[in-house]
C-alpha cells in the first residue's frame, strides 16, 4: 500500500513528479503514461519503492518492490531535482525523513 504523498522518478529525467494523494494518482495516471519508460518508479512517504507497470495500455499500476530508498539517496535525488529547477544552495538541502523531502519537492513545484 502506498503512503501518500509520493514522487515519481522517471527514467532518464532528473526532475521528480509530485503526486499528492491516491485521488490525484487516479486522476493523472493516464497522462503519466506519456512519460512512462520501463525503469520508472514511485517513492512513497515511507521511502518504499514501487515499479510502475502498464495495465491494459491505459493505466499505470504501482507494484511494490519491498525495497526502500535510503535517506541519503533520496536527498541526492531531491538535490538534483532542485538543481534542474535552478534553485540555489542545493548543497544545503537536507531533511530528516523521506516525507519531509517529498514535501520539499511539492513546495519547489508550488514556487514555479
Per-segment meaning from a language model:
Residues 1-21:
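Short, extreme N-terminal segment that most often corresponds to the first beta-strand
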